[in-house]
């Protein structure tokens, strides 16, 4: 029992030092600016994280836009939910299903190009505070879009606009351009045990 006060004092000293370091970093950080965030990797949670940021942005009263490049054959929970707020979210489902479902490369390219035209409109609009480009990485990975054009459009967006790009296999150039990159890893997934996608979890 006698060492409890000492432990508490040591803990307090550590936390004070940590706070001082964090406070200094915040004070020395540049002004606010629009961020490019890339969520990639084979694990679950990329789109879920993006839509969490969408909800957070809406909570701050921001105007937002969403373009889904691959998903589209079936309505997802996020689409059904965010479409309830048309005055705040422009939600575009432009895909025609996963690539193994369509089995038509030219059709996939046409769908991706149409989706990018919608994306460019959002990326040029300074009133839009957050743009989610869901599964854009997949479209780029399969060569459905011109990578240089995509990167150029992202760089030319309004200075305070945030963009979240999701999908496996993010291109090295996209990672280089991004401000924040998160790679989702797989430790265990229900699908490996033969459990199909569930409403409210994957759908």
Predicted segments with their positions:
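Extreme N-terminal, non-catalytic leader segments
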Residues: 1-35
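Short gly/ser/thr-rich secondary-structure transition/capping motifs
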Residues: 19-22, 113-116, 163-166
């Amino acid at each position: 029992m006698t060492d409890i006060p000492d432990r508490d004092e040591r803990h307090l000293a550590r936390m004070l030092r940590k706070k001082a370091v964090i406070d200094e970093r915040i004070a020395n950080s540049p002004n606010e600016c629009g961020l490019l965030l890339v969520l990639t990797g084979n694990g679950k949670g990329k789109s879920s994280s993006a839509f969490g940021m969408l909800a957070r942005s809406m909570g701050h009263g921001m105007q937002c836009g969403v373009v889904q490049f691959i998903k589209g054959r079936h309505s997802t929970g996020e689409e059904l939910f965010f479409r309830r707020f048309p005055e705040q979210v422009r939600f575009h489902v432009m895909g025609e299903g996963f690539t193994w479902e369509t089995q038509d490369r030219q059709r996939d390219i046409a769908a991706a190009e149409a989706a990018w035209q919608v994306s460019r409109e959002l990326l040029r609009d300074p009133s839009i505070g957050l743009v989610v480009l869901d599964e854009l990485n997949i479209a780029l990975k399969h060569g459905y879009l011109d990578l240089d054009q995509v990167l150029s459009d992202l760089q030319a967006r309004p200075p305070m606009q945030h963009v979240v790009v999701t999908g496996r296999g993010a291109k090295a150039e996209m990672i280089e351009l991004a401000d924040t990159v998160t790679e989702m890893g797989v430790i265990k997934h229900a699908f490996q045990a033969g459990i199909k996608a569930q409403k409210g979890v994957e759908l």
